[in-house]
Amino acid sequence: MTRPRAAMRARVVGLVFTVGLAGLRAVVWAAESASDPRRSGFDFMTPELQAMQRDDALNPGMLWIKDGEALWNRNVGTADRSCASCHGAATATMRGVAARYPAFDTASGRPVTLSQRINLCRVERQRAPAFGFESDELLALEGYLAHQSRGQPLAPPSDPRLEPFRARGERLFRQRIGQLDFSCAQCHDEQAGKRLAGSAIPQAHPTGYPIYRLEWQGLGSLERRLRGCMSGVRAEPFAYGAPELVELELYLAQRAAGLRIETPAVRP
């Protein structure tokens, strides 16, 4: 056999092996998914919305991701530093980071969300003003970081310091609130898959935040979604950044551990 033909055969064998390995991984992933009763909100959407999320050229949330990339590399504050000045290229250093939030912050002695960590770094390292809650800048940067972990499983820390906060989050999830006297669990555990006001009730796994919601016509945080649910049962929403919301996020992350990150997800 001539060398060119041998090289071509080696390339073909390598390609077949690579494709076969990818197929095997897909089969294993599908088998894992089939045995797990938990489902992402993606599985409850129409085929049209699923297609919108899958295609980055159609996914409107990608506009914020692009803005987040620019913010990551922009020098700001009296320190005249960018996020990249400390962390380098996000594509290399941030993969898997969002999957581990909320995480324990030693300085404050409590858990912080990814958006809170961004603002802590901004104030302490860049010497710049904190972004406002739900601002386009904060959502863009949080979205950009979470996007680096797309396809990675949620991996909440097993830090024992988080346990009392996570336990409080679970109690909040199961506590009846508001004039309608409803809990998160009653909707998202007991009624998941049924329909409410024309939309499917999801299991409430935070796999795609920040998400683009058609209802919002923009990107929004998990805190915004939680506050919206509280208003929906006619309860007084917690303030943005409230410890209760962080504790609830901490529990939700544990409840969804192992499910894949989708950011930016698209929802109705």
Model feature map: region roles:
Residues A79-A84, A197-A200, V266:
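Extended intrinsically disordered, low-complexity coil regions enriched in Ser, Thr, Gly, Ala
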Residues T2-I65, A92, P102-A167, G193, ...:
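Post-cleavage N-terminal segment of exported redox proteins
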Residues N75-V76, R176-G178:
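Short coil/turn linking the two alpha-helices of tandem helical-hairpin repeats
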Residues R54-S85:
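N-terminal, post-signal-peptide region of Sec/Tat-exported proteins
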Residues W72, L172-F173:
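Conserved short C-terminal alpha-helix that flanks the catalytic cleft of nucleotide-sugar-dependent
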Residues M94-Y101, L196-P202:
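Short cysteine/histidine-rich zinc-coordinating motifs and their immediately flanking basic loops
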Residues A185-E215, L219:
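An amphipathic alpha-helical core segment
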Residues D80-T91, L141, G169, Q179-Q191, ...:
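The canonical Cys-X-X-Cys-His
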